[in-house]
């Protein structure tokens, strides 16, 4: 996740000796005497916000962040609360399940919880990182038409193979948000915005009247110059989304299972090569997720 890269490169200050990586999946090796939810041998995956079990976001529910304010998953063994994990989706490998707690849940909350996405809706996803790819997969499983953007024609072909209905190369089309409006007859119902400052105005332009924009990233900068009147004249809903609760994760797991969704893994590294994995992530050449195996 981009969050993990920020922890690794000092972009997010953490305590000395903090174990990184917000997401992980594995098998329970032992349980304490008071544990009732799990038993030895259960296959589980982590929660990004272990204290956010259900309900709406509140500050006290998101102070504990795995791999940030508390130790993360880049280790052979971890001792955690029974509420700090959920079950894994059936049919996935540990590596595939480990891609979901941050990127998958962010996409799920944006589209299904906040966005109330339905079959027949349309969605714009930006780029080929983890959130955008799983959002594309969740949307197609739900019967949604998807427009995807990329700066690479080769990646564009891979997006089409995953089910994208339209692909736009924004490196070749400076007015790509106008192109989105043209091919969707007025704009999309939902936008997953990962670029922040660099893409927000494009997202506003690409959304249809009464459309929804989920701000989930800042890859293009933390500040944006936007046409504010366009937001209220189009009566857009613009909201920030940061991962989600345990209850949301359980719902996402059921959707992954019913849709037979297989997360896209670009590369897998041994834990000992974590620095190499981060360097590859920073190069922005990946398609989907990068995982570590132990």
Regions found by a protein language model. Name each.
Residues 8-53, 69, 89-91:
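Glycine-rich beta-strand-centered segment in the early N-terminal region that forms part
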Residues 48-126:
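NAD(P)H dinucleotide-binding glycine-rich loop of Rossmann-like/cofactor-binding domains
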Residues 106, 131, 199:
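Hydrophobic/small residue at the entry helix of a nucleotide-binding pocket
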Residues 122-128, 140-202:
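Adenosine-nucleotide cofactor-binding segment
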Residues 201, 246-294:
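C-terminal hydrophobic helical "lid"/dimerization subdomain
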Residues 209-216, 225-267:
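Rossmann-fold dehydrogenase core element
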């Amino acid at each position: 996740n981009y969050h993990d890269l920020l922890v690794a490169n000092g972009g997010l200050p953490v305590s000395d000796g903090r174990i990184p990586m917000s997401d992980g999946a594995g098998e329970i090796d032992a349980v304490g005497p008071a544990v009732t939810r799990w038993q030895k041998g259960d296959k589980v995956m982590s929660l990004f916000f272990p204290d956010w079990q259900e309900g709406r976001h509140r500050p006290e529910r998101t102070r504990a962040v795995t791999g940030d304010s508390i130790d993360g998953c880049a280790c052979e063994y971890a001792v955690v609360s029974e509420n700090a994990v959920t079950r894994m989706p059936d049919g996935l490998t540990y590596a595939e399940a480990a891609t979901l707690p941050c990127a998958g849940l962010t996409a799920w909350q944006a589209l299904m919880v906040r966005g109330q996405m339905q079959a027949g809706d349309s969605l714009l996803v930006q780029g080929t990182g983890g959130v955008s790819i799983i959002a594309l997969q969740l949307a197609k499983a739900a019967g949604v038409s998807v427009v995807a953007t990329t700066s690479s024609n080769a990646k564009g072909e891979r997006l089409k193979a995953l089910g994208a209905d339209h692909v736009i190369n924004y490196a070749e089309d400076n007015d790509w948000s106008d192109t989105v409006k043209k091919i969707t007859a007025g704009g999309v119902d939902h936008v997953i915005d990962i670029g922040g400052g660099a893409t927000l105005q494009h997202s506003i332009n690409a959304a249809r009247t009464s459309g929804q924009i989920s701000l989930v990233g800042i890859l293009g900068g933390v500040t944006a110059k936007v046409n504010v009147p366009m937001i209220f004249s189009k009566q857009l809903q613009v909201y920030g989304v940061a991962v989600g609760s345990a209850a949301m994760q359980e719902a996402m797991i059921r959707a992954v299972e019913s849709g037979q969704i297989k997360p896209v893994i670009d590369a897998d590294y041994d834990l000992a090569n974590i620095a190499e994995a981060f360097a590859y992530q920073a190069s922005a050449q990946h398609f989907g997720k990068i995982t570590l195996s132990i």
